[in-house]
């Protein structure tokens, strides 16, 4: 059974539910303090929260911690690396994913359920979805406005949409270019996404649509 490290920085607050989602998806998971090593694990998740209270920029300080050197090695070795919300911000700050997360177009914290369109199923985290599938997850962020100079040169995995899959301005909660909600590296083993799949991993929570992210990751790590 693949083992996953869920990295905990000062200010991380989505670690317990992320561990639970991985276990429900068939993997083993442990919370790992950022000063410890993750080398013995098969994959790594950087969960949501407010690492270092978002000082300087969201994710900026966490991205410069020593543990990120091991995360970089994971990425280069082809092992799965998932960044959720603040974790996505950390991955862009560390240069492991292209682009940047800027303050929301309307400068306030946004917490609500949204629809996503699955744009790329050829990644370690989306192989169990159908291309074009519409899924539902919550978001909770103040700096989720994704920007990249040339969107045509990146792998867009998730896009904000309406319930019918239309990529409208109204469906875009934060002003992200091309309604982008999640991107991967060229190899497809590193994914950053602003929506919270761990909060959509049980019907009791309102949706199980996010569970496939973790199930896909577990299946990928078995290879």
From Swiss-Prot:
Ligase as UniProt keyword: yes
SMART domains tied to this protein: GATase_5 (SM01211)
Catalytic residues in the record: 85 (nucleophile), 196, 198
Principal location class: cytoplasm
Complexes and interactors: Part of the FGAM synthase complex composed of 1 PurL, 1 PurQ and 2 PurS subunits.
GO biological process, one term: 'de novo' IMP biosynthetic process
Key word tRNA processing present: no
GO molecular function: ATP binding; glutaminase activity; phosphoribosylformylglycinamidine synthase activity
Annotated EC: 6.3.5.3, 3.5.1.2
Function noted in UniProt: Part of the phosphoribosylformylglycinamidine synthase complex involved in the purines biosynthetic pathway. Catalyzes the ATP-dependent conversion of formylglycinamide ribonucleotide (FGAR) and glutamine to yield formylglycinamidine ribonucleotide (FGAM) and glutamate. The FGAM synthase complex is composed of three subunits. PurQ produces an ammonia molecule by converting glutamine to glutamate. PurL transfers the ammonia molecule to FGAR to form FGAM in an ATP-dependent manner.
Biological source species: Pyrococcus abyssi (strain GE5 / Orsay)
PROSITE patterns membership: GATASE_TYPE_1 (PS51273)
Superkingdom classification of source: Archaea
Keywords: ATP-binding, Cytoplasm, Glutamine amidotransferase, Hydrolase, Ligase, Nucleotide-binding, Purine biosynthesis
Gene: purQ
Gene Ontology cellular-component terms listed: cytoplasm
Compartments where located: Cytoplasm
Domain Glutamine amidotransferase type-1 intervals: 4-223
Catalytic activity: N(2)-formyl-N(1)-(5-phospho-beta-D-ribosyl)glycinamide + L-glutamine + ATP + H2O = 2-formamido-N(1)-(5-O-phospho-beta-D-ribosyl)acetamidine + L-glutamate + ADP + phosphate + H(+); L-glutamine + H2O = L-glutamate + NH4(+)
Protein name: Phosphoribosylformylglycinamidine synthase subunit PurQ
Gene3D superfamilies: 3.40.50.880
């Amino acid at each position: 059974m693949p083992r996953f490290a869920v990295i905990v920085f000062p200010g991380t607050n989505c670690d317990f539910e992320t561990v639970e989602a991985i276990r429900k998806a068939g993997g083993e998971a442990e919370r790992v303090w950022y000063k410890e090593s993750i080398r013995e694990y098969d994959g790594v998740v950087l969960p949501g929260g407010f690492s270092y209270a978002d000082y300087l920029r969201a994710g900026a300080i966490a991205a410069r911690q020593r543990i990120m050197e091991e995360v970089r090695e994971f990425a280069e070795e082809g092992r799965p690396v998932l960044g959720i919300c603040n974790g996505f911000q950390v991955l862009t700050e560390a240069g492991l994913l292209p682009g940047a997360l800027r303050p929301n177009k309307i400068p306030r914290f946004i917490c609500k359920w949204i629809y996503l369109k699955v744009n790329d199923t050829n990644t370690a985290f989306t192989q169990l979805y159908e291309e074009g599938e519409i899924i539902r997850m919550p978001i909770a962020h103040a700096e989720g406005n994704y920007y990249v100079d040339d969107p045509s040169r990146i792998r867009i995995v998730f896009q904000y949409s309406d319930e019918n899959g239309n990529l409208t301005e109204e469906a875009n909660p934060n002003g992200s270019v091309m309604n982008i909600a999640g991107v991967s590296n060229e190899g497809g083993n590193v994914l950053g996404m602003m929506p919270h799949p761990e909060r959509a991993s049980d019907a009791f929570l309102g949706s199980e649509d996010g569970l496939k992210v973790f199930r896909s990751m577990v299946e990928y790590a078995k290879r």
